[in-house]
Each structure stands twice: as structure tokens, then as C-alpha cells.
Amino acid sequence: GMKLLYSVAWPGQSLYSNKPIQTPADLVGTKMRAYNPTSTRIAQLLKAQPVTIQLSELGQALATNTVNNFLTSSASGVESKLYEQIKYFYPVNAWLPRNATVVNQKAFDSLDKSLQDAVLKAAAAAEKRGWESSERLDKEYLKELAAKGMTVAEPSDALKKEFANIGNTMTEEWVKAAGADGKAIVDAYRKR
């Protein structure tokens, strides 16, 4: 009953750490912030200890060494002033959270063709503008994190590979749980 008009990504979820991270082994046994089943599973697959902490509690958790590292966006790092308590940032883009704008399919179908075309044209323009804004803002946030004293470094090939492997593992776990319909969705996505 819904029609997707457009979606736009937030800046990617990246790795913040209180020590340098060169390989996945550097994360083994560390205390990683988790705030939902997905982030908990990522921590488990990295062999880190998941610690449930909400963003609003992260400053205190860092101050008390309750967590050593976490995944969040460059935007959250700037807006929450995480640079005051943590020193290393790696743009691993573990995932790209998205906002989606949808419309009721019946309502859309009730519009005349010219109005449907106008809505779709406006949606395409909004999506393009949104993606450009997200990318621009991410670059600005990264510059600000560095200006505030954080080391902003590209993740090593080993770290990139580990996050890719985790993505594949979690996708396969989801497909297994979702069944044939889930497999069809993933297969269609991979064919794009």
C-alpha cells in the first residue's frame, strides 16, 4: 500500500576508538558500545564485548572507561562533542542509515499523470540534493573532528575486509531467518 518516492542516507556509521585500530585483532576483547541487536551482533562478530549504552550516556561511559570504542556517524561525533573524550576515527561506513519518503499508493494512483510525473520529478531532485548534502556534511564533520584534535584515518585493508565479512555474515543470517522472501529481496538487490 505504499510507494517509495525517495531515500537519502545519513553519513555512514564509522568507528571511534580510544586507541589506534590497525587490524580486527585490535578490537578483540575491547568494550564496544551497542545500542540495538545489529550493533550487538557486530560487536560479537568482532569478538568485542558489547556494552549497551545510548548516545546520551556515551560521554559518561567514555569518562568511566565503560566503553573503548563504538560505531556512530561523523555527525554524532561533532554534535555530541565526542572529540573531547576519544581520539581515533576510522570511516568504515559499517552501514548507511537512510530516511525514506513514501506516499500511499492509492493516493498516488488517484493523481492525474501530469501530477504524478511532477511528484516523481520533485522526489528525484530531493533525493539527489539529499545525497549531495549528506556527502558534503560528512566531509565537513570529518574536517571538524580533525580540527578538534582527533586522528581521522582511513581504515586498514584488514579492517575494511573484516567489516565486509561481517556484512556478508549478517546478511546471510538475516536471509536464513527471513526465508524465501528474504532471499528473493537480497538476490534482487545484488542484481542491481
Where are these regions (language model features)?
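N-terminal secretory/targeting leader peptides
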Residues: 1-192
